[in-house]
């Protein structure tokens, strides 16, 4: 049996450094943080969104409303996932109408998760603007015309490789690794 090669790309300190940079970019672009809300895409995007909001609050002193969204039933491939997809809760405890929503996910790959998240958001209102923040952009792998506004890092991979973001909240450690078959 062949072993999968695991290549570390970013450690916990690197993830923290990236989140600080992303927070500063958001603050710089949005001089008025009042209309800003942050929504994380389940699962790891939720934890990254909370960390990003906490980092913005530490830097700027202003708390940003944070929520999370499950996109399972909005995916265009959900029937391929299985007959009983696991649907998680969506928690958006604030209006998003006329707000700037920063949608947060761990990895931008084909763009299909982001498309599903945009579809899901419309069930909760009509934001003035939606921006996308990702920890990792798998450069050159897009199937849809979607691009992140805030990127932690670009990683070049081939389609057979997997980019995994590990977070202490779900995985017991913080790291970004590329798994090669």
Swiss-Prot record:
BP GO annotations:
regulation of DNA-templated transcription
Q: Where is this motif: PRPP-binding?
A: 101-113
Its keywords, alphabetically, are: Glycosyltransferase, Transcription, Transcription regulation, Transferase
> Domain of life here?
Bacteria
Which E.C. number(s) belong to this protein? 2.4.2.9
Query: What GO terms are given for molecular function?
Result: uracil phosphoribosyltransferase activity
Q: Where are the transmembrane segments?
A: none
Q: Which family does it belong to?
A: Belongs to the purine/pyrimidine phosphoribosyltransferase family. PyrR subfamily.
- UniProt function note: Regulates the transcription of the pyrimidine nucleotide (pyr) operon in response to exogenous pyrimidines.
PANTHER family reported for this sequence: BIFUNCTIONAL PROTEIN PYRR (PTHR11608:SF0)
> Cross-referenced HAMAP family, in alphabetical order?
PyrR
What this protein is called in its record is: Bifunctional protein PyrR
To which species is this protein native?
Desulfosudis oleivorans (strain DSM 6200 / JCM 39069 / Hxd3)
């Amino acid at each position: 049996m062949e072993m999968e090669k695991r290549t570390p790309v970013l450690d916990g300190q690197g993830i923290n450094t990236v989140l600080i940079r992303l927070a500063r970019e958001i603050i710089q672009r949005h001089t008025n943080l009042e209309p800003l809300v942050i929504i994380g895409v389940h699962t790891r995007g939720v934890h990254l969104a909370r960390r990003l909001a906490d980092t913005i609050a530490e830097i700027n002193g202003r708390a940003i409303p944070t929520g999370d969204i499950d996109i399972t039933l909005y995916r265009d491939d959900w029937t391929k996932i299985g007959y009983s997809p696991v649907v998680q809760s969506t928690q958006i405890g604030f209006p998003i109408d006329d707000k700037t929503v920063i949608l947060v996910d761990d990895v931008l790959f084909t763009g299909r998760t982001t498309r599903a998240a945009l579809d899901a958001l419309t069930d909760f209102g009509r934001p003035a603007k939606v921006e996308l923040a990702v920890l990792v952009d798998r450069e050159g792998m897009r199937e849809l015309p979607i691009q992140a506004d805030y990127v932690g890092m670009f990683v070049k991979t081939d389609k057979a490789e997997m980019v995994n973001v590990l977070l202490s909240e779900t995985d017991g450690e913080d790291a970004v690794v590329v798994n090669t078959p």
